[in-house]
């Protein structure tokens, strides 16, 4: 039997082995219906019951209040970034964007054809090594919403607290940190998250939105681009990615069985601490310049003394069963992604490899 490696990919990311094994066992026949879950109608009583159960489990996992709709939509976060202004900003209105890394810049770019953009804070001036202090943010007077990216996978910075933006709706991309730590959903008006990091496979996106927001007119658009239409049809306005939805449900059940978000917050802090300690105690052989208060627990970028060492590290790590550690092309270096499904044993193996590599080449 082939041994599974430790997969540090930033997304699509490692999935819990129990989830994969259950999906494997149910591949040919699910729930005694005589067919795979990916073969049955999304409008069948069996699948509708499955979908309702998954929503209930996700609400339990994240503590989603009743006055929020939970949507399961095709695609990923980038699609939502374009849909936000179409749904919630009137023509000619301004939206505020907090820029803390590559993905918040992407969100701004996707929204810019449909809304006037005000950059309230820009971490690029400091190389995205810190999150600009809230006291210096330049919020608009009548913004349609404020947008933030909770965790930046490439630059490795993370909001540890929810920023106070007053009465303006706060929208957040939680793709890479949803269910990784406890959050108060009620402090946000809309949360969106591509599933492929902590919630399941690529191809499905969760949107959690305050129901009163769905009453906004926004801009002219088709029903398929309208959150209210998806909410009215229980995320089945069009044929949904049923197998992805099913896998997301298995992943959520696994997280609940393991102790919920509180337990994963504990695990994630412990895993990240192991890697950061190894970096900080390496005498400069490994470098991470992110301000300590905003260091990401999900994505840890670091650099060796030169690009040749970076390449050697990634290649030897792969040979040692540590996959996908090469940094993003935008910044280079090395990146370890430690999502919920990454076991402590994988992080311990990485840290042991880091020590060994430094002994041999440091």
Curated annotation (Swiss-Prot):
It is found in: Cytoplasm. Disulfide bonds: none annotated. InterPro entries: Aminotrans_V_dom (IPR000192), Pser_aminoTfrase (IPR022278), PyrdxlP-dep_Trfase (IPR015424), PyrdxlP-dep_Trfase_major (IPR015421), PyrdxlP-dep_Trfase_small (IPR015422). Pyridoxal 5'-phosphate binds at residues 77-78, 103, 153, 173, 196, 238-239. It catalyses: O-phospho-L-serine + 2-oxoglutarate = 3-phosphooxypyruvate + L-glutamate; 4-(phosphooxy)-L-threonine + 2-oxoglutarate = (R)-3-hydroxy-2-oxo-4-phosphooxybutanoate + L-glutamate. Pathway: Amino-acid biosynthesis; L-serine biosynthesis; L-serine from 3-phospho-D-glycerate: step 2/3; Cofactor biosynthesis; pyridoxine 5'-phosphate biosynthesis; pyridoxine 5'-phosphate from D-erythrose 4-phosphate: step 3/5. Binds 1 pyridoxal phosphate per subunit. It holds the Pfam family Aminotran_5. L-glutamate binds at residue 43. Keywords: Amino-acid biosynthesis, Aminotransferase, Cytoplasm, Pyridoxal phosphate, Pyridoxine biosynthesis, Serine biosynthesis, Transferase. Its EC number is 2.6.1.52. One of its GO terms (cellular component) is cytoplasm. Its cofactor is pyridoxal 5'-phosphate. It comes from the Bacteria. GO terms for molecular function: O-phospho-L-serine:2-oxoglutarate aminotransferase activity; pyridoxal phosphate binding. The modification N6-(pyridoxal phosphate)lysine is found at residue 197. Catalyzes the reversible conversion of 3-phosphohydroxypyruvate to phosphoserine and of 3-hydroxy-2-oxo-4-phosphonooxybutanoate to phosphohydroxythreonine. NCBIfam families: PRK05355.1, serC_1. Homodimer. Belongs to the class-V pyridoxal-phosphate-dependent aminotransferase family. SerC subfamily. This is Phosphoserine aminotransferase.
């Amino acid at each position: 039997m082939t041994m599974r490696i430790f997969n540090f990919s930033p997304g699509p990311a490692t999935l819990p082995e129990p989830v994969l094994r259950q999906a494997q066992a149910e591949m040919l026949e699910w729930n005694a219906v005589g067919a795979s879950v990916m073969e049955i109608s999304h409008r069948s009583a069996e699948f509708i019951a499955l979908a309702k159960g998954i929503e209930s489990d996700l609400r339990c996992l994240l503590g989603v209040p009743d006055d929020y709709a939970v949507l399961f939509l095709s695609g990923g976060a980038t699609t939502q970034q374009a849909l936000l202004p179409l749904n919630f900003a009137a023509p000619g209105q301004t939206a505020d964007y907090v820029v803390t890394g590559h993905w918040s810049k992407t969100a701004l770019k996707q929204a810019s054809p449909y809304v006037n953009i005000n950059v309230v804070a820009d971490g690029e001036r400091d190389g995205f090594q810190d999150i600009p202090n809230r006291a210096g943010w330049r919020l608009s007077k009548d913004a349609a919403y404020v947008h933030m990216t909770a965790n930046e996978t490439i630059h490795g910075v993370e909001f540890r607290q929810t920023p106070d933006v007053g009465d303006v709706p706060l929208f957040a991309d939680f793709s890479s940190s949803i269910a990784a730590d406890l959050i108060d959903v009620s402090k946000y008006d809309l949360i969106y998250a591509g599933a492929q990091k902590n919630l399941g496979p690529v191809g499905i996106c969760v949107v959690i939105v305050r129901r009163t927001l769905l009453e906004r007119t926004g801009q002219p658009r088709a029903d398929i681009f309208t959150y209210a239409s998806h909410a009215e049809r229980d995320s089945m306005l069009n044929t949904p990615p049923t197998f992805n939805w099913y896998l997301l449900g298995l992943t959520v059940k696994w997280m609940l069985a393991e102790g919920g978000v509180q337990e994963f917050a504990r695990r994630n802090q412990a895993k990240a601490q192991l890697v950061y300690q190894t970096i900080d105690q390496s005498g400069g052989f490994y470098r991470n310049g992110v301000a300590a208060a905003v260091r990401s627990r999900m994505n840890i970028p670091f650099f060796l003394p030169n690009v040749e060492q970076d390449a050697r590290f990634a290649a030897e790590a792969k040979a040692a069963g540590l996959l996908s550690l090469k940094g993003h092309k935008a910044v280079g270096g090395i990146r370890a992604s430690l999502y919920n499904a990454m076991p402590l044993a994988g992080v311990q193996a990485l840290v042991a490899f880091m020590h060994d590599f430094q002994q041999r080449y440091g």
